[in-house]
């Protein structure tokens, strides 16, 4: 049975959501892993605490060999939309003992930290979560959502709220990054002979009209498939960055 098949059921089982915040790219020493589930203690654990459950710490969840500690948090707005816009969720975490405020001060509000949301079911959790083990443990059964911290929105003594963005939004990219037309994208972006897309480094020179020239300073690619073939040869692999078939389409 797979997670996808479970989600098709009327009662898929107990859902588990785990969070990880990775700021190692800008100097954080550890990945922060946490969950917001209230997991009951066993009678044996309560008895060992002298019958006072308040003496027991909140229980961690182990997933894929990593410990996710209990920490009050919630995420809103991660649902997909139908209008083509990317979601911009809000992650709210408890500011216990001002610990999150301290992280914000130390690491520039955790901007661009990678936030990964793991969704799975309790029956797939690591065996060490269960006193008797777990024969259905399967670390591959999860759904991932990845965002990056784009801004710190609210900060109080109780909570800190972060605005998340998709990786594409954070980098300011637009869709599509390439247009479908018959001209070479590398040429249009002035990347002829740069090695970034266009790797031509030969000694065949042509002007913008595809006429052969001896002076390298007159060498200019016009971005056509013909220009690419003249330089690389008809029988060689071409790094052409266009879509020749689009020239057959007429509006």
Curated annotation (Swiss-Prot):
Primary subcellular site in the record, as a coarse category: virion
Gene Ontology molecular function terms on file: 4 iron, 4 sulfur cluster binding; metal ion binding
Cofactor(s), by name: [4Fe-4S] cluster
GO cellular component: host cell cytoplasm; virus tail
Cofactor note: Binds 1 [4Fe-4S] cluster.
GO biological process annotation, one example: symbiont genome ejection through host cell envelope, long flexible tail mechanism
Any Pfam family the entry gives: Phage_tail_L
Keyword match Metal-binding: yes
Sorted UniProt keywords: 4Fe-4S, Host cytoplasm, Iron, Iron-sulfur, Late protein, Metal-binding, Viral genome ejection through host cell envelope, Viral long flexible tail ejection system, Viral penetration into host cytoplasm, Viral release from host cell, Viral tail assembly, Viral tail protein, Virion, Virus entry into host cell
Cell compartments where the protein resides: Virion; Host cytoplasm
InterPro entries: Phage_lambda_L (IPR006487)
Family, as annotated: Belongs to the lambda-like tail tip protein L family.
Annotated function: Part of the distal tail tip complex which plays a role in DNA injection during entry, and in tail assembly initiation during exit. The tail tip complex is assembled successively with three tail central fiber proteins J, one tail tip protein I, one tail tip protein L and one tail tip protein K. The tail tip complex interacts with tail measure protein to initiate tail tube assembly. The formation of the tail tip complex is completed by the addition of tail tip protein M, which is followed by tail tube polymerization.
UniProt comment concerning the protein's domains: The C-terminus coordinates an iron-sulfur cluster.
Record-given protein name: Tail tip protein L
Lineage of origin: Viruses, Duplodnaviria, Heunggongvirae, Uroviricota, Caudoviricetes
